[in-house]
Protein backbone atom coordinates (compact mmCIF):
# COMPACT_ATOMS: atom_id res chain seq x y z
CA UNK A 1 0.00 0.00 0.00
CA UNK A 2 2.80 2.44 0.87
CA UNK A 3 4.55 1.76 -2.43
CA UNK A 4 1.35 2.54 -4.35
CA UNK A 5 0.80 5.73 -2.36
CA UNK A 6 4.38 6.93 -2.79
CA UNK A 7 4.37 10.23 -4.63
CA UNK A 8 0.56 10.35 -4.58
CA UNK A 9 -0.13 11.59 -1.05
CA UNK A 10 2.51 12.86 1.40
CA UNK A 11 3.67 10.17 3.81
CA UNK A 12 5.62 11.02 6.96
CA UNK A 13 7.13 8.36 9.23
CA UNK A 14 7.64 9.42 12.83
CA UNK A 15 10.10 7.19 14.67
CA UNK A 16 9.40 7.66 18.37
CA UNK A 17 10.93 4.41 19.61
CA UNK A 18 13.06 1.52 18.32
CA UNK A 19 12.25 0.85 14.65
CA UNK A 20 14.09 -2.28 13.53
CA UNK A 21 14.35 -4.47 10.45
CA UNK A 22 11.20 -4.63 8.32
CA UNK A 23 9.64 -1.80 10.33
CA UNK A 24 12.63 0.40 9.49
CA UNK A 25 12.25 -0.44 5.81
CA UNK A 26 8.56 0.51 5.99
CA UNK A 27 9.54 3.86 7.49
CA UNK A 28 11.97 4.41 4.63
CA UNK A 29 9.12 4.01 2.12
CA UNK A 30 7.75 7.32 3.39
CA UNK A 31 8.51 10.68 1.80
CA UNK A 32 9.84 12.08 5.06
CA UNK A 33 11.35 10.34 8.09
CA UNK A 34 11.47 12.10 11.47
CA UNK A 35 13.29 10.55 14.44
CA UNK A 36 12.61 11.84 17.95
CA UNK A 37 14.97 11.68 20.90
CA UNK A 38 15.58 10.08 23.30
CA UNK A 39 14.01 6.74 22.34
CA UNK A 40 13.71 6.98 18.55
CA UNK A 41 16.12 4.77 16.60
CA UNK A 42 16.09 3.53 13.01
CA UNK A 43 18.04 0.27 12.62
CA UNK A 44 18.39 -2.74 10.33
CA UNK A 45 19.26 -4.92 13.35
CA UNK A 46 18.93 -4.29 17.06
CA UNK A 47 21.75 -3.83 19.59
CA UNK A 48 21.48 -7.40 20.90
CA UNK A 49 21.91 -8.94 17.45
CA UNK A 50 24.85 -6.72 16.51
CA UNK A 51 26.45 -7.09 19.93
CA UNK A 52 26.45 -10.85 19.43
CA UNK A 53 27.91 -10.56 15.93
CA UNK A 54 30.50 -7.90 16.80
CA UNK A 55 31.36 -9.29 20.24
CA UNK A 56 30.94 -5.91 21.89
CA UNK A 57 28.17 -3.89 23.46
CA UNK A 58 26.58 -1.19 21.35
CA UNK A 59 23.67 1.12 22.11
CA UNK A 60 20.61 1.73 19.94
CA UNK A 61 21.45 5.44 19.90
CA UNK A 62 24.83 4.65 18.33
CA UNK A 63 23.26 2.36 15.74
CA UNK A 64 20.46 4.56 14.52
CA UNK A 65 19.56 7.27 17.00
CA UNK A 66 18.13 10.55 15.74
CA UNK A 67 21.46 12.26 15.02
CA UNK A 68 23.04 9.14 13.50
CA UNK A 69 20.01 8.49 11.29
CA UNK A 70 20.10 12.00 9.84
CA UNK A 71 23.88 12.13 9.43
CA UNK A 72 23.88 8.86 7.49
CA UNK A 73 20.93 9.86 5.31
CA UNK A 74 18.46 7.36 6.79
CA UNK A 75 16.22 10.13 8.18
CA UNK A 76 15.46 13.74 7.28
CA UNK A 77 14.90 15.35 10.68
CA UNK A 78 16.19 14.74 14.22
CA UNK A 79 14.03 16.24 16.97
CA UNK A 80 14.76 16.69 20.66
CA UNK A 81 11.32 15.53 21.86
CA UNK A 82 8.19 13.83 20.56
CA UNK A 83 6.40 17.18 20.72
CA UNK A 84 9.11 18.72 18.52
CA UNK A 85 8.69 15.84 16.08
CA UNK A 86 4.93 16.46 15.91
CA UNK A 87 5.54 20.14 15.25
CA UNK A 88 8.07 19.31 12.52
CA UNK A 89 5.62 16.96 10.82
CA UNK A 90 2.96 19.69 10.83
CA UNK A 91 5.46 22.17 9.38
CA UNK A 92 6.37 19.78 6.56
CA UNK A 93 2.72 19.07 5.77
CA UNK A 94 2.13 22.81 5.67
CA UNK A 95 4.55 22.97 2.74
CA UNK A 96 3.03 20.11 0.74
CA UNK A 97 -0.20 19.64 -1.21
CA UNK A 98 -2.79 17.14 0.03
CA UNK A 99 -2.02 14.98 -3.01
CA UNK A 100 -0.14 15.11 -6.31
CA UNK A 101 -3.11 16.63 -8.16
CA UNK A 102 -3.38 19.70 -5.93
CA UNK A 103 -1.19 22.75 -5.45
CA UNK A 104 0.84 23.29 -2.31
CA UNK A 105 -0.62 25.76 0.23
CA UNK A 106 -0.09 29.36 -0.86
CA UNK A 107 0.02 32.57 1.15
CA UNK A 108 1.65 35.88 0.24
CA UNK A 109 3.93 36.72 3.13
CA UNK A 110 6.89 38.57 1.66
CA UNK A 111 7.91 40.77 -1.26
CA UNK A 112 10.09 38.89 -3.78
CA UNK A 113 11.55 42.19 -4.93
CA UNK A 114 13.12 42.96 -1.56
CA UNK A 115 16.83 43.79 -1.51
CA UNK A 116 19.12 41.11 -0.10
CA UNK A 117 21.75 42.73 2.10
CA UNK A 118 25.16 41.05 1.99
CA UNK A 119 23.97 38.36 -0.42
CA UNK A 120 27.27 38.40 -2.34
CA UNK A 121 29.46 38.27 0.74
CA UNK A 122 30.27 34.56 0.50
CA UNK A 123 27.36 32.87 2.28
CA UNK A 124 27.22 29.13 2.75
CA UNK A 125 24.49 27.05 1.14
CA UNK A 126 22.01 27.22 3.99
CA UNK A 127 22.48 30.99 4.27
CA UNK A 128 21.96 31.46 0.53
CA UNK A 129 18.71 29.51 0.65
CA UNK A 130 17.53 31.42 3.72
CA UNK A 131 18.26 34.70 1.90
CA UNK A 132 16.30 33.67 -1.19
CA UNK A 133 13.32 32.24 0.68
CA UNK A 134 10.62 34.04 2.61
CA UNK A 135 11.83 34.82 6.12
CA UNK A 136 11.55 31.88 8.51
CA UNK A 137 10.08 29.51 5.92
CA UNK A 138 13.02 27.15 5.29
CA UNK A 139 12.92 23.50 6.38
CA UNK A 140 16.27 21.81 5.68
CA UNK A 141 16.06 18.08 4.93
CA UNK A 142 18.93 15.84 6.02
CA UNK A 143 20.97 18.60 7.65
CA UNK A 144 24.54 17.41 8.10
CA UNK A 145 24.26 14.52 5.65
CA UNK A 146 26.92 15.54 3.10
CA UNK A 147 27.75 19.12 2.15
CA UNK A 148 24.75 19.28 -0.19
CA UNK A 149 21.80 21.24 1.17
CA UNK A 150 18.21 20.27 0.35
CA UNK A 151 15.33 22.28 1.75
CA UNK A 152 11.72 23.27 1.29
CA UNK A 153 10.91 26.94 1.59
CA UNK A 154 8.55 29.62 0.37
CA UNK A 155 9.17 32.23 -2.31
CA UNK A 156 6.48 34.90 -2.38
CA UNK A 157 4.26 32.44 -0.55
CA UNK A 158 4.78 29.49 -2.90
CA UNK A 159 6.51 26.28 -1.87
CA UNK A 160 9.88 25.76 -3.57
CA UNK A 161 12.46 22.96 -3.31
CA UNK A 162 15.95 24.37 -2.89
CA UNK A 163 19.08 22.41 -3.80
CA UNK A 164 22.66 23.50 -3.10
CA UNK A 165 25.43 21.26 -4.43
CA UNK A 166 28.04 22.19 -1.87
CA UNK A 167 31.49 23.57 -2.64
CA UNK A 168 34.30 21.70 -4.37
CA UNK A 169 34.06 18.30 -6.02
CA UNK A 170 30.71 16.53 -5.83
CA UNK A 171 30.76 12.98 -4.43
CA UNK A 172 28.30 10.14 -4.93
CA UNK A 173 26.54 10.68 -1.60
CA UNK A 174 25.79 14.32 -2.41
CA UNK A 175 24.33 13.38 -5.79
CA UNK A 176 22.16 10.61 -4.34
CA UNK A 177 20.80 13.01 -1.74
CA UNK A 178 19.98 15.64 -4.36
CA UNK A 179 18.45 13.14 -6.81
CA UNK A 180 16.07 11.75 -4.21
CA UNK A 181 15.00 15.25 -3.19
CA UNK A 182 14.40 16.35 -6.79
CA UNK A 183 12.20 13.29 -7.38
CA UNK A 184 10.30 14.01 -4.17
CA UNK A 185 9.67 17.61 -5.28
CA UNK A 186 8.63 16.52 -8.75
CA UNK A 187 6.05 14.09 -7.35
CA UNK A 188 4.20 17.00 -5.74
CA UNK A 189 4.74 19.53 -8.53
CA UNK A 190 7.07 21.67 -6.42
CA UNK A 191 9.49 23.76 -8.52
CA UNK A 192 13.20 23.17 -7.94
CA UNK A 193 15.72 25.99 -7.53
CA UNK A 194 19.29 24.68 -7.89
CA UNK A 195 22.32 26.57 -6.60
CA UNK A 196 25.47 25.11 -8.15
CA UNK A 197 28.87 25.71 -6.54
CA UNK A 198 30.61 22.52 -7.65
CA UNK A 199 33.95 22.26 -9.45
CA UNK A 200 33.07 18.86 -10.91
CA UNK A 201 32.84 15.22 -9.90
CA UNK A 202 35.07 13.88 -7.16
CA UNK A 203 37.77 11.42 -8.20
CA UNK A 204 38.55 8.60 -5.76
CA UNK A 205 41.55 6.27 -5.67
CA UNK A 206 39.46 3.08 -5.69
CA UNK A 207 37.51 1.60 -8.57
CA UNK A 208 34.51 0.96 -6.31
CA UNK A 209 34.13 4.63 -5.37
CA UNK A 210 34.74 5.77 -8.95
CA UNK A 211 31.91 3.51 -10.10
CA UNK A 212 29.74 4.79 -7.25
CA UNK A 213 30.28 8.35 -8.49
CA UNK A 214 29.44 7.31 -12.05
CA UNK A 215 26.24 5.56 -10.94
CA UNK A 216 25.17 8.48 -8.75
CA UNK A 217 25.89 11.00 -11.52
CA UNK A 218 23.67 9.13 -13.96
CA UNK A 219 20.94 8.88 -11.31
CA UNK A 220 21.14 12.63 -10.73
CA UNK A 221 20.97 13.44 -14.44
CA UNK A 222 18.00 11.11 -14.80
CA UNK A 223 16.19 12.71 -11.84
CA UNK A 224 16.50 16.20 -13.31
CA UNK A 225 15.70 15.04 -16.85
CA UNK A 226 12.51 13.19 -15.94
CA UNK A 227 11.25 15.93 -13.62
CA UNK A 228 8.39 17.85 -15.23
CA UNK A 229 8.12 20.45 -12.50
CA UNK A 230 9.67 23.89 -12.95
CA UNK A 231 13.47 23.97 -12.70
CA UNK A 232 15.63 27.04 -12.23
Indicate where each model-derived feature is located:
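Ligand-binding clefts of soluble mixed alpha/beta catalytic domains
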Residues: 1-232
Amino acid sequence: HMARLSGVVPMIAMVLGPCVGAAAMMAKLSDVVIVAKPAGALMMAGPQVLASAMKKDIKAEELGGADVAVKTGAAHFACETEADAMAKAKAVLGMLPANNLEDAPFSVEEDMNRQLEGFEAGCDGAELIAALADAGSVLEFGKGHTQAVTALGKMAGRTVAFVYTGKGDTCDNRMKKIARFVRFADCYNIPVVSLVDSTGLKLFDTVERQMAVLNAASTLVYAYSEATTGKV
